[in-house]
């Protein structure tokens, strides 16, 4: 899938980026991009990094899309099929365990600063949705409340806020959900349209 880049490094540009399914051979590039982007964040704690070994496993077992500018990886999206694993975000949304197999985790969406401003997070998600495993009815995600850029992108893409809670051993996160059997667009934190009950916000 080819997408048009309107700017690169903050300057007007007109060239294409290739979005394609990635495999284990791309693990080193994914890992390097993760670390480069995290190191440049004003608050690196907003993003919990993965190990090279975990990324290689995701690339083998799950759905991973890379955005390539020639030979350079400029963006990626990792969607995990967690099934009955306790790490499935469905476990935190009061979804019955027998339905967990129908939910996937939007694990991470990374865009290098050179390529921001092209709507790549949304375009990567759109590419992922065309390649989903049959039977997936919803996607869960987490975003740091301090990461307004990613939160706005997620809401604009159809995710809705389910709750705010501690995750990953004490990190403050919004838990988001996208139900694939509804028409999206209602991104208010009331939870309408997801079929998932909204829980109270942390400390409210």
Question: Residue locations for each model-derived region?
Answer:
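Conserved acetyl-CoA-binding loop-helix of GNAT-fold acetyltransferases
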Residues: 108-111, 117-130, 152, 156
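Conserved active-site alpha-helix within GNAT-family acetyltransferase domains
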Residues: 145-164
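Conserved acyl-donor/pantetheine-binding loop and adjacent beta-alpha core of acyl/acetyltransferases
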Residues: 78-108
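Active-site rim helix/loop that mediates acceptor-substrate recognition in acyltransferases
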Residues: 42-70, 78
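Conserved GNAT acetyl-CoA-binding A-motif
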Residues: 132-144
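C-terminal "cap" of GNAT-fold acetyltransferases
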Residues: 6, 167-187, 198-204
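A short beta-loop-alpha structural element at the N-terminal edge
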Residues: 16-32, 43
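A short, internal acetyl-CoA/4′-phosphopantetheine-binding micro-motif in the GNAT/acyltransferase core
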Residues: 94-96, 106-117, 143-144
């Amino acid at each position: 899938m080819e997408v048009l880049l309107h700017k690169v490094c903050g300057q007007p540009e007109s060239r294409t980026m290739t979005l394609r399914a990635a495999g284990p051979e791309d693990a080193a590039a994914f890992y390097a991009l993760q670390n480069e982007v995290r190191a440049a964040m004003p608050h690196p704690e907003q993003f919990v990094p993965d190990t090279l070994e975990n990324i290689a496993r995701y690339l083998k077992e799950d759905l991973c899309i890379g955005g390539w500018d020639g030979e350079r990886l400029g963006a990626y999206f990792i969607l995990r099929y967690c099934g009955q694993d306790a790490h499935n975000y469905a476990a935190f949304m009061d979804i019955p365990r027998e339905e967990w197999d129908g939910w996937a985790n939007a694990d991470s969406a990374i865009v290098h600063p050179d390529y921001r401003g092209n709507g790549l997070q949304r375009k990567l998600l759109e590419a992922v949705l065309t390649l989903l495993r049959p039977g997936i009815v919803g996607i869960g995600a987490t975003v740091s409340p301090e990461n307004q850029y990613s939160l706005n992108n997620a809401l604009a893409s159809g995710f809705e806020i389910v709750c705010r809670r501690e995750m990953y051993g004490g990190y403050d996160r919004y838990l988001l959900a996208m139900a694939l059997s509804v028409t999206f667009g209602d991104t208010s934190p009331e939870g309408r349209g997801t079929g998932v009950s909204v829980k109270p916000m942390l400390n409210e």
